[in-house]
Design a protein with these regions (language model features):
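Conserved P-loop NTPase/AAA+ ATPase motor core
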Residues: 247-339
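Conserved AAA+/SF3 P-loop NTPase catalytic/coupling segment centered on the Walker-B
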Residues: 117-144, 173-182
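AAA+/P-loop NTPase substrate/partner-engagement loops
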Residues: 74-104, 111, 196
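AAA+/SF3 P-loop NTPase mechanochemical coupling elements
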Residues: 116-120, 124, 131-132, 151-170, ...
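Pre-Walker A (pre-P-loop) alpha-helix and adjacent loop at the N terminus of AAA/AAA+ ATPase modules
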Residues: 2-3, 9-54, 339
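Conserved Walker
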Residues: 43-51, 109-112, 128-129, 145-162, ...
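Walker A/P-loop
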Residues: 47-84, 113, 140
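Conserved C-terminal "switch" segment of AAA+ ATPases
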Residues: 3-11, 24-25, 116, 172-182, ...
């Protein structure tokens, strides 16, 4: 606890965070500018009674966690990642009273102590949109701008919080209480465009996969890259691209029994990944007239796609409609059209 409360000077150099993010995250110059602007605004309007809280909101696989790590590196601070998803009560923040069995300090204090961290750390609460009502209530108290400390029930003392930099990463902003959103700076992390994805695969993903699997001279043809991004890696981020590349490399190394001069082709993608995962715009003419099926438009940031919704009759089920998948809002209209 003595080390945790030790004060460490925080240095902020204007533009350093933006430069680091641009160098680390290909195709996210806009994100770098937004994050740097938010940190600069907090720095210029510095209030010793208020800690800095940023919210990185965007689709899965768009580099929110990596951005938090880069921010800590650029600011010269330590970094601690905590998974907020699944937290059921306030002990995550406040700890447990000593009179209760298996009592202990809050997870935040335990992890800071384990890493010999200080209260000047960058704390990343990941999956912040998957918390419970009680955990959100405790976090709302942590964000109180009028207090400089938060109280730990087990340690029975107040922990200074004003120098902490809190970064929340989440996918669905609608699940977060409005009272919390009012106390944080939101930075939207948009998905990658098709051209950005191509550049990321060529400049980053191929090198990353080659290093991981110790492959010399790894490449992919332009037609194969076009096919992969159009019909298989359909999510806004690049996480599914990396998973597909991993499958392709494992199969190629296994079949060719070598780790040199590997080239991913269209035939390899078709053979390993199988049928395409979603309908694209080119399929619209031949697929729209199929009974029980309708096309739906999906959008995330500046990325759009065309997907199919299918209705299947179950003779063993009573008169009821069940849906599966992430169908929300206007997407349900396409379901009724298909029926």
């Amino acid at each position: 606890l003595v080390h945790i409360t030790k004060e460490i000077p925080v240095q902020y150099e204007m533009g350093e965070v933006e430069q680091r993010l641009k160098k680390k995250r290909c195709g996210q110059d806009d994100l770098a500018g937004q994050v740097d602007d938010a940190l600069m605004a907090e720095y210029l309007s510095r209030n010793d009674k208020r800690m800095t809280v940023l919210g990185l909101w965007g689709p899965p696989g768009t580099g929110k966690t990596t951005a938090a790590e880069v921010i800590a590196e650029a600011l010269g601070r330590g970094y601690l990642k905590l998974n907020f998803g699944g937290t059921g009560d306030s002990t995550f923040i406040n700890g447990t009273k000593k009179s209760i069995a298996n009592a202990g300090p809050s997870l935040l204090i335990r992890e800071l102590a384990r890493k010999n961290g200080t209260y000047s750390y960058v704390i990343n609460f990941d999956e912040f949109d998957k918390g419970s009502t009680e955990s959100y209530q405790a976090f709302h108290e942590l964000l109180d701008p009028e207090s400089t400390c938060f109280y730990d029930e087990f340690l029975e003392c107040s922990i200074p919080k004003n120098d902490l930099l809190i970064i929340l990463t989440f996918n669905d902003i609608r699940k977060i209480p409005t009272a919390i959103l009012d106390r944080i700076r939101i930075v939207e992390v948009s998905g990658y465009s098709l051209s950005e994805k191509k550049q990321i695969v060529k400049n980053a993903v191929l090198n990353k996969m080659a290093e991981r699997f110790r492959v010399n001279n790894l490449s992919i043809t332009d037609d194969a890259l076009e096919l992969l991004l159009h019909e298989y890696a359909v999510m806004p981020g690049i996480r599914d691209v990396e998973r597909d590349m991993e499958k392709l490399l494992i199969r190629m190394i296994k079949n060719e029994k070598k780790c040199d001069n590997l080239c991913i082709s269209v035939d390899t993608i078709r053979e390993v990944l199988g049928s395409k995962r979603s309908l694209v715009l080119d399929d619209k003419g031949s697929k729209c007239a199929v009974p029980g099926q309708a096309m739906a438009l999906a959008v995330s940031g500046n990325i759009g796609s065309c997907i199919a919704i299918q209705v299947v009759q179950d003779p063993y089920q009573k008169d009821a409609v069940e849906t599966s998948g992430l169908l929300r809002g206007s997407c349900l209209e396409s379901l009724w059209d298909a029926m």
